[in-house]
């Protein structure tokens, strides 16, 4: 499970010790965070490209535990494109990208207890439910964020402008 933010680390590692937490990224609080994390947390540092895609692919879920407003987190779209469902905080544009129980789950921002409950729920679904969720996440990304989807929307908008100017 890939995870980030203070909320995710507060109690989660000690409350859910059988989950391996993989934290990707860097920043000025890295050393402080390392000292606060449980033994089941692994800091991976900055990742990008194929290495990041491989981490997302191998994760059961990607946790986007933002505590500030994000409009359209690319992490969610990248995860969906790979077929990895997302657990995200119910804040900013995140809940607009997560279809509850279909492409992932949301939890209350800054609530490590709610995050723990959501992760526990996510980890308890059947293999069939997980496969369906993975397929739905990928379909959602392809339908809304693929090149083809973008081109079709762009063509539709251009056609609308052309049609309006014909009048």
Model-based region annotation:
Residues 57-71, 84:
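Acidic donor-binding loop of glycosyltransferase active sites
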Residues 77, 91-101, 105-106:
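Short acidic/histidine- and often glycine-rich active-site loop of Leloir-type glycosyltransferases
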């Amino acid at each position: 499970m890939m995870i980030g933010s203070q909320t995710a680390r507060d109690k989660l590692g000690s409350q859910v010790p059988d989950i391996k937490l993989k934290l990707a990224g860097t920043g000025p609080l890295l050393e402080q965070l390392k000292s606060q994390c449980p033994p089941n947390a692994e800091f991976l540092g900055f990742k990008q490209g194929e290495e990041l895609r491989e981490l997302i692919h191998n994760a059961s879920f990607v946790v986007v535990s933002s505590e500030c407003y994000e409009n359209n987190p690319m992490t969610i779209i990248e995860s969906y494109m790979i077929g990895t469902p997302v657990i995200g905080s119910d804040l900013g544009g995140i809940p607009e990208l997560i279809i509850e129980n279909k492409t992932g789950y949301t939890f209350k921002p800054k609530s490590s207890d709610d995050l723990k409950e959501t992760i526990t729920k996510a980890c308890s679904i059947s293999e069939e439910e997980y496969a369906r969720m993975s397929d739905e996440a990928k379909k959602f990304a392809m339908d809304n964020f693929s090149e083809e989807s973008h081109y079709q929307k762009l063509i539709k908008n251009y056609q609308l402008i052309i049609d309006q100017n014909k009048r």
